[in-house]
């Protein structure tokens, strides 16, 4: 496939706004055929207002799930409203419960507890699926450019939130033992190709993504006997709001051209991997990472 280029563009705030992107990311691939794989399940998706998170929310809803998602208050209301509206349109066809959009700073334990409690309270105590997806990244050429505050911020969003959300969701998932289907409950963590290949200008971000891989493997071992599966997806270059919010215009223009397929992926091409891992189709999988990255060969 020929190399693809995007129009030069830049956004000044993280994690970026999907409604301001050109072109807009694709959330649902046109050929997608839902099959009720997640019917009667309750899912939480962090960072679900845009990008990969939005695509996961919509695919889960198409598969019959009731979906709640989080977003950053004061920055992502418009994207969150778009996602919530799309979820309600789908819900009218599937008969799932009304979706929820929850503003939250997930870098802190108590905030994560409140999100989980709010979702469980709204849906009769049930949580079957947790997708940890919230992330931010900042391009910096040298380790000496990263302050202690910078490091803490990225780690709080990218890995602390995964730990805290999982900690509180697991308490609810344990109550679902025997009622969540053959595949049990599922936690799915979004890592990155950078965890495997490295990225010299995204040092702190890359470190968090490596931590997510290790966290996924360890938690999978801890929860295996409890009927809770823990897996992850490590996307390659995907066209999401994080890209124009992270990089200079020229880098955005060339984004994704370095992979064997010669182009960036769309969120619509990543979301089906989350559906698979959340569904009973993956009932014998835990501790694994799926690599949706345009043909880059990685180990692990």
Swiss-Prot record:
A molecular-function term among this protein's GO annotations: oxidoreductase activity, acting on CH-OH group of donors
EC number from the UniProt entry: 1.1.1.-
Leader peptide range in chain numbering: none
Region annotation (Disordered) ranges: 1-23
Superkingdom in the source lineage: Eukaryota
Coiled coil: none
Active site, UniProt feature: 205
InterPro entries according to UniProt: NAD(P)-bd_dom_sf (IPR036291), Sc_DH/Rdtase_CS (IPR020904), SDR_fam (IPR002347)
Annotated family: Belongs to the short-chain dehydrogenases/reductases (SDR) family.
Name of this protein: Glucose and ribitol dehydrogenase homolog
């Amino acid at each position: 496939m020929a190399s693809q280029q995007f129009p030069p563009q830049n956004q000044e705030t993280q994690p970026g706004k999907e409604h301001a992107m050109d072109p807009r990311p694709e959330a649902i691939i046109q050929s997608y055929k839902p099959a009720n794989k997640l019917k009667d399940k309750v899912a939480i998706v962090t960072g679900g207002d845009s990008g990969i998170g939005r695509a996961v929310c919509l695919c889960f809803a198409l598969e019959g799930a009731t979906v709640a998602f989080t977003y950053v208050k004061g920055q992502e209301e418009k994207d969150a409203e778009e996602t919530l509206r799309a979820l309600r349109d789908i819900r009218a066809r599937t008969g799932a419960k009304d979706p929820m959009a929850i503003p939250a700073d997930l870098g802190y334990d108590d905030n994560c507890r409140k999100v989980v409690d709010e979702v469980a309270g709204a849906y009769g105590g049930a949580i079957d699926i947790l997708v940890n997806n919230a992330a931010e990244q900042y391009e910096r050429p040298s380790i000496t450019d990263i302050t202690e505050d910078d490091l803490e911020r990225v780690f709080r969003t990218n890995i602390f939130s995964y730990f805290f959300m999982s900690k509180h969701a697991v308490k609810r998932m344990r109550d679902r033992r025997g009622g969540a289907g053959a595949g049990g409950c599922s936690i799915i963590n979004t890592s990155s190709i950078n965890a495997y290949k490295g990225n010299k200008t995204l040092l702190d971000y890359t470190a968090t993504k490596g931590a997510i891989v290790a966290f996924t493997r360890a938690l999978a071992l801890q929860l295996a006997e409890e009927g809770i599966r823990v897996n992850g997806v490590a996307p390659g270059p995907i066209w999401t709001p994080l890209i124009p919010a992270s990089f200079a215009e020229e880098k955005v223009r060339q984004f994704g051209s370095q992979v064997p397929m010669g182009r960036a992926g769309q969120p619509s091409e990543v979301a089906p991997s989350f559906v698979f891992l959340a569904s009973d189709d993956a009932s014998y999988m835990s501790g694994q990472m799926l690599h949706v990255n345009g043909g880059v060969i990685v180990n692990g």
